C-alpha cells in the first residue's frame, strides 16, 4: 500500500530537484567529535562519578547562557555568539540546581525528520546493528542521550513531530506539550506563532513526569491527582484511529497494548480520518513556510546544508498563499478535535506507520527524508496545538523489540496523558 503524499506536488518536485542537485555538488565538512557519546551531544559536560543529581540534557536549539546555540548548523556554530541568557524554559531547572550535562545534537535548524546531521555526526540509534537506523528528528540527540543513560531527562522541541518521532525511533518516551504552555523565549524558531513547542523526553514515563515538573511548576501534583482520579485503564475511553499505509504488525501491537491496558476502545469514523489527512498536509505546509519565515537569512549561506536550504526554499514557494490557506482551516480542525474529545478521553494511533528506516549506504538522503516525512503521524497534532505522548510498546518484529503508541489529548491534558502512558507502560509484559 502506498503512503500518502502530504506536499503540494509542484513545490515538492521543485524542492526535491533542488536538494538532489545541491547535494550532488557539495562535499560537507565534518566536525571532528569524540565518539564516546555516539554523537548524542554537541557539547557534553559529564557529571562526576557516582553523581546522584538529576542530569538534564538540553537540545542545542535552546539557549544555555555562555554557550553558542548551534541549532545543529555548522554556519551558526562558527558565526554565532554565546547566549547571553538561558532560555526561559530552563528557569525551574536552574532554581532547583538541576545539573545540565550538555547540549544535544539535532537536525540542522530542526528541519529534518530523520535526525541525520552531516556536520556534527548522526546520533546512533540504539537499534542499529548491521545497518545504521535513523535516530529520528529533529531531537535526535535528546532521544539517544536518555536511551544511553547519559541524561535522566532531555528537553527537545516539537514543531511537526520532533520530540515524538525520535522517541519512536529510539524506543523512549516523548511528550509534545500544548502549544503556548511552555515559553519559547530563547528557543531557535521554526513556526513559533502556531507550531513550536518544548517538551521532555525520558527512558520511561516517570522521567518524563520529572521533566514536565521542570517545565511547569506544580506539574507533579497535577500528575498525582490524575493518577488518583483514573488509576486504571477501565476508566479511560480511547478513540482508535487507523491510517492507510500502516504496517499491520504495528497496528496489531497497538491494539494489543490498548487491550492489555483495559482501555475502553472505540474506532473513529472514516470522516475523521479524512480530516486528519488534510490536517497533516496543512501542518506540513505551515512548518515548511515557517522555515522560510524564520530561516530565510540562511538560504544562501555557505556551511548550511543543501537539504536544509531546499526545505527553506520550499517554504518560500508555500508562503504566503498556501500557508494562509492552511491557517484558515486550522480553527475547523481544532473544532473537529474538540468534538471528538466530547466522546473519548484520548486518540490512539501509531507514532510512525512503519518501523524506523535504515540510512542507505549509498543514495540520496533527500529521498529518505521524504519517506520519513510521509510515515510520521505527528503533524496534525501540532497543527491543532494539542498535547501528544509517544510511548514504546512491544511489537513482534524481526529487527525491533518495540514500536511507538501515540496518545493525543485535549489541550492542557499533559498530566492525564502521562497517567494513560503509565497504565500502558505498566501493562507491558
Which role does the model predict for each range below?
Residues 24-82, 86-87, 107-112, 356:
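Short, well-ordered alpha-helical
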Residues 13-21:
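Bacterial N-terminal signal peptides
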Residues 294-383:
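Serine-dependent amide/ester hydrolase catalytic core
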Residues 2-13:
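Bacterial N-terminal signal peptides that target proteins for export
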Residues 76-83, 123-137:
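Short pre-catalytic strand/loop immediately N-terminal to key active-site residues, enriched for Gly-Thr
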Residues 27, 99, 148, 153, ...:
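Structural helix-boundary/capping segments
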Residues 53-76, 282-334, 390-401:
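Short helix-loop capping/hinge segments that flank enzyme active sites or metal/cofactor-binding pockets
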Residues 56, 62, 68, 89-95, ...:
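Gly/Ser-rich, acidic/histidine-flanked active-site/gating loops
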Amino acid at each position: 500500500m502506498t503512503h500518502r503524499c502530504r506536499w503540494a506536488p509542484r513545490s515538492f518536485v521543485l524542492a526535491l530537484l533542488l536538494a538532489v542537485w545541491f547535494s550532488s555538488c557539495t562535499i560537507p565538512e565534518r566536525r571532528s567529535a569524540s565518539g564516546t557519546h555516539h554523537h548524542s551531544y554537541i557539547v557534553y559536560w559529564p557529571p562526576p562519578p557516582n553523581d546522584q543529581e538529576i542530569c538534564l540534557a538540553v537540545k542545542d536549539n535552546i539557549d544555555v547562557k555562555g554557550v553558542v546555540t548551534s541549532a545543529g548548523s555548522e554556519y551558526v556554530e562558527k558565526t554565532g555568539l554565546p547566549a547571553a541568557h538561558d532560555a526561559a524554559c530552563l528557569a525551574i531547572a536552574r532554581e532547583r540546581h538541576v545539573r545540565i550535562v550538555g547540549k544535544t545534537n539535532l537536525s540542522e535548524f530542526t528541519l529534518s525528520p530523520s535526525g541525520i546531521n552531516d556536520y556534527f555526526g548522526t546520533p546512533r540509534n540504539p537499534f542499529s546493528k548491521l545497518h545504521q537506523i535513523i535516530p529520528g528528528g529533529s531531537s535526535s540527540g535528546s532521544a539517544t542521550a536518555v536511551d544511553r543513560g547519559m541524561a535522566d531527562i532531555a528537553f527537545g522541541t516539537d514543531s511537526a513531530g520532533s520530540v515524538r518521532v525520535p522517541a519512536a525511533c529510539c524506543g523512549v518516551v516523548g511528550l509534545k506539550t500544548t502549544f503556548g504552555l511552555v515559553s519559547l523565549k530563547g528557543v531557535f524558531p521554526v513556526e513559533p506563532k502556531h507550531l513550536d513547542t518544548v517538551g521532555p523526553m525520558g527512558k520511561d514515563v516517570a522521567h518524563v513526569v520529572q521533566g514536565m515538573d521542570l517545565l511547569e511548576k506544580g506539574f507533579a501534583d497535577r500528575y498525582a491527582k490524575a493518577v488518583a482520579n483514573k488509576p486504571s485503564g477501565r476508566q479511560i475511553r480511547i478513540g482508535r484511529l487507523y491510517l492507510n499505509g500502516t504496517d499491520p504488525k504495528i497496528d496489531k501491537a497497538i491494539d494489543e497494548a490498548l487491550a492489555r491496558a483495559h482501555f475502553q476502545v472505540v474506532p473513529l469514523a472514516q470522516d475523521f480520518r479524512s480530516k486528519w489527512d488534510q490536517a497533516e498536509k496543512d501542518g506540513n505546509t505551515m512548518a515548511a513556510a515557517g522555515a522560510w519565515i524564520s530561516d530565510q537569512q540562511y538560504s544562501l549561506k555557505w556551511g548550511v546544508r543543501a537539504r536544509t536550504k531546499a526545505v527553506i526554499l520550499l517554504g518560500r514557494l508555500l508562503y504566503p498563499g498556501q500557508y494562509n490557506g492552511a491557517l484558515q482551516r486550522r480553527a475547523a480542525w481544532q473544532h473537529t478535535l474538540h468534538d471528538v474529545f466530547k466522546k473519548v478521553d484520548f486518540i490512539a494511533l501509531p507514532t510512525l506507520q512503519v518501523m524506523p528506516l535504515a540510512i542507505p549506504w549509498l543514495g540520496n538522503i533527500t529521498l529518505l527524508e521524504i519517506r520519513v516525512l510521509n510515515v510520521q503521524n505527528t503533524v496534525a497534532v501540532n497543527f491543532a496545538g494539542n498535547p501528544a505522548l509517544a510511548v514504546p510498546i512491544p511489537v513482534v518484529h524481526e529487527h525491533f523489540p518495540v514500536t511507538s503508541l501515540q496518545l493525543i489529548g485535549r489541550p492542557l491534558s499533559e498530566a492525564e496523558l502521562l497517567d494513560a502512558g503509565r497504565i500502558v507502560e505498566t501493562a507491558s509484559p
